[in-house]
């Protein structure tokens, strides 16, 4: 049986996550389950998209990901099931479904086609997405879950792309983790090992390979575990040190231009 990985904004203080696990067990008894993240800020599609991108390459082949951060629940937004390479995704069509790139197959999930009761207007993670994830985990045919959808018309991912500059890139802070590290949208492979990052006219961070290379409370630039460049302070918070927040710009330049 295919494993199911869960990414939601349901939190851990209510019954929501437990009930989703119960529904998965009901429709796919014994299904292996992976809790990726249930602490996405409520309705934060941007953060959910980033966390999904970070986790995706490390999931086992055949894995079914149920990603539900769904501020449009109960509206006419589509519920989707997608095949992406050797993995599957069930998610609302609000940018999450498009966050991983083109899919080979996309269907709009139809509860009637799956023999389900009409889903709740407020908890479709339980009534629609969890049964859909279980359907795929059992090895059932994705194309029998509903009507096919052209992947070109999906709601686009909210994460911005880096803006090329003559000597580097204008990057954007796209996530701040619990350590205060500031992840940008620029892959580490986009610039050389001597690159620098500037966020004001007189504040510049040099690139290093490890946190321990930072001197004291120095803000440094390094490639994070997901492959994106981030600003960090060894043993401290880059968010506090710089005052930067998600959505702010950082200029990341090649060796011949340190910014400023």
Enumerate the predicted regions with their spans.
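N-terminal glycine-rich anion-binding loop in soluble enzyme alpha/beta folds
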Residues: 2-40
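Active-site histidine-anchored catalytic micro-motif
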Residues: 3, 27-33, 44-50, 60-69, ...
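Fold-independent oxyanion-binding glycine-rich loops
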Residues: 8-10, 36-38, 68-71, 84-85, ...
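Anionic-ligand-binding alpha/beta catalytic cores of soluble enzymes and soluble regulatory domains
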Residues: 116-185, 190
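A conserved acidic, glycine/proline-rich C-terminal tail/linker
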Residues: 183-243
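Surface-exposed interaction regions enriched in Ser/Thr/Asp/Glu
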Residues: 246-255
């Amino acid at each position: 049986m295919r494993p199911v990985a869960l990414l939601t904004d349901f939190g851990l203080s209510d019954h929501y996550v437990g009930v989703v696990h119960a529904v998965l067990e009901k429709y796919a008894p014994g299904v292996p389950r992976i809790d990726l993240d249930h602490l996405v800020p409520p309705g934060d599609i941007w953060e959910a998209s980033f966390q999904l991108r970070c986790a995706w390459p490390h999931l086992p082949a055949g894995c079914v990901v149920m990603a539900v951060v769904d501020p449009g629940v109960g509206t006419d937004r589509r519920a989707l099931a997608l095949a992406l390479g050797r993995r599957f995704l069930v998610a609302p069509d609000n940018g999450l479904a498009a966050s991983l790139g083109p899919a080979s197959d996309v269907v709009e999930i139809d509860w009637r086609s799956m023999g389900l009761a009409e889903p709740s207007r407020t908890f479709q993670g339980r009534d629609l997405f969890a049964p859909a994830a279980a359907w795929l985990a059992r090895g059932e045919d994705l194309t029998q879950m509903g009507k096919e959808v052209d992947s070109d018309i999906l709601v686009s991912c909210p994460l911005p792309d880096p803006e090329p500059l003559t000597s580097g890139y204008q990057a954007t802070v796209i996530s701040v983790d619990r350590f205060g590290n500031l992840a940008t949208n620029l892959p580490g492979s986009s610039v050389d090992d001597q690159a620098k990052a500037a966020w004001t006219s007189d504040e510049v961070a040099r690139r290093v390979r490890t946190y321990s290379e930072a001197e004291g409370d120095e803000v440094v630039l390094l490639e994070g575990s997901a492959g994106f460049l981030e600003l960090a302070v060894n043993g401290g918070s880059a968010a506090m040190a710089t005052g930067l927040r998600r959505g702010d710009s950082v200029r990341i330049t090649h060796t011949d231009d340190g910014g400023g």
